[in-house]
Structures are given as C-alpha cells and as structure tokens.
Amino acid sequence: MPISNKIYPRTGDTQTVYLKNVITNPNIKIGDYTMYNDFVNDPKGFEQNNVLYHYPINHDKLIIGIFCSIACGAKFLFNSANHSMSSLSTYPFPLFFEEWALDKKDVIKSWDNKGDIIVGNDVWIGYEAVIFAGVKIGDGAIIGTRAVVTKDVPPYTVVGGVPAKPIKKRFDDKTIDTLLDIRWWNWSDEKIALNLDAIQAGCVERIVEV
C-alpha cells in the first residue's frame, strides 16, 4: 500500500513530492496523495514559488483536494495581486499608508478581494497554468497548459486558453454523475487498489464494492 505521509513518492525522484508534506502555511490545505512535479525549481519550494501574493493580512486560503496532479510552474495568484477597479485610481494608496497618513488596517482596500482558491479532487493542472483568486475548480477537471483560469470550472470539464474556456467534458453526464456520487477518492487505499483496473480503464461498470 502507498504511504501518504512521505515527501518523495518515487524512489530516486526528487522532482516530485506529495505536496501536503512540504506545506507549512496554515492557510494552505492539501489533500493526501496530491502531487507536484517541478523540473526547474525544488518542488519543496511550492509555497514560495507557486502560491503568489498570498499575504496573511487577507486570510485567503488555497484548498486543494485529494489525488490532484499539479505540473511544473503552475501558479495560484491571490487577491493582493489585484488593484482596486472600483476606486477612481488603480494606484494602491492604502498600501503606502505611511506616505499618505492613512490607517494601516485599511491596507486591504488596495485590492479587490475575490476570495479563496478551491481545487476539488482528482484535478489535473497543466504546465504553467495560472489560477486566479476566487476560482473554484470542480472534481475531475483538467486545466490545460498555460491556461489562465479566471472563472469557476465545472466538474470533469477540460479547459484551456487565455482566458480559460471549456473545451469538452471528459465523460457523458451519466458517468460524471456516477463519479461524483461514488467519490472514489474518499475510498480506503485498499478499495482503490482493488479497483485500479476499472479506474484506469475509465469503466465505472467494473467498480467492485467491498
């Protein structure tokens, strides 16, 4: 059986990590077996290199589910990357509160707050994709290479482009409903192992109950 609390799941491969085991920020929550591969930087530096503008003052969260696959260079762009579009100027005056005799607690008025980034389970995020603040990605979705995701992605939907748009659904509606109902990623490791042939063959009819 696999061991979910190790850092490197593959012998001799230090470019791939189980992400949960290298995260220290309490505002980043990662599910078991979700992996990140990086052939440019140390994958253990995910917090610093891939989760951007994620400042404690916002209390915004990155939540990623179980069994996700995140490719090299994928980025999660948080609220502090924004500037306010509702004010007359996009210049972040509150950020320079000392210069302009403003109240320090109003720093967050420098940007529009879109909320957390939430990634479901069994999601594949492609090479150098960018996920914006406030986006929710459904279970089983695929994010294409260098896609810029500015809107929510439905479950089991493939998206790509700038900005990312739906390309196709991975399965028919009946199969998607079945997958969302059985939620295989919540099974025990033993039940997953028993059903790997069916999972890899894309055949829900062959699922074995235990």
For each predicted feature, which ranges?
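Structural signal for interior beta-strand "rungs" in well-ordered beta-sheet cores
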Residues: 16-83, 94-99, 106-166
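Glycine-rich phosphate-binding loop and adjoining beta1-alpha1-beta2 segment
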Residues: 84-88
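C-terminal segments of enzyme domains that contribute to small-molecule binding surfaces
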Residues: 93-94, 101-131, 163-210
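N-terminal capping/interface segment
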Residues: 1-20
